[in-house]
């Protein structure tokens, strides 16, 4: 008989990193050009006036102003309203 038992292996021990998605600047909040407004997978929110889209569908401000959420043609849209 063997002196040592076979070393058991665990099937656990893996976990993916959090993605930190979601709305970063809410309606009415002031933003500076370049601020991230929404981090998302796919276009849950679409870009409106003064809002750009990154390659991972991140929405960001193109101008200084206030964030405004709305609906146009059954799409949720994010605008940056400048004074």
Curated annotation (Swiss-Prot):
InterPro entries: Ribosomal_bL27, Ribosomal_bL27_CS. It comes from Bifidobacterium animalis subsp. lactis (strain AD011). GO terms for biological process: translation. Residues 1-20 are annotated as: Disordered. Signal peptide: none annotated. Keywords: Ribonucleoprotein, Ribosomal protein. GO terms for molecular function: structural constituent of ribosome. Residues 7-19 have a biased composition (Polar residues). GO terms for cellular component: cytosolic large ribosomal subunit. The keyword Repeat does not apply. HAMAP family: Ribosomal_bL27 (MF_00539). Belongs to the bacterial ribosomal protein bL27 family. The keyword Heme does not apply. This is Large ribosomal subunit protein bL27.
């Amino acid at each position: 008989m063997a002196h040592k038992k076979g070393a058991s292996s665990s099937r656990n021990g893996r976990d993916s990193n959090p993605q930190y998605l979601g709305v970063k600047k809410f309606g009415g909040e002031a933003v500076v050009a370049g601020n991230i407004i929404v981090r998302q997978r796919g276009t849950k929110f679409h870009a409106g006036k003064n809002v750009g889209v990154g390659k991972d569908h991140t929405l960001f401000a193109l101008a200084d102003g206030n964030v405004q959420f709305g609906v146009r043609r059954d799409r949720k849209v994010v605008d940056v309203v400048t004074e």
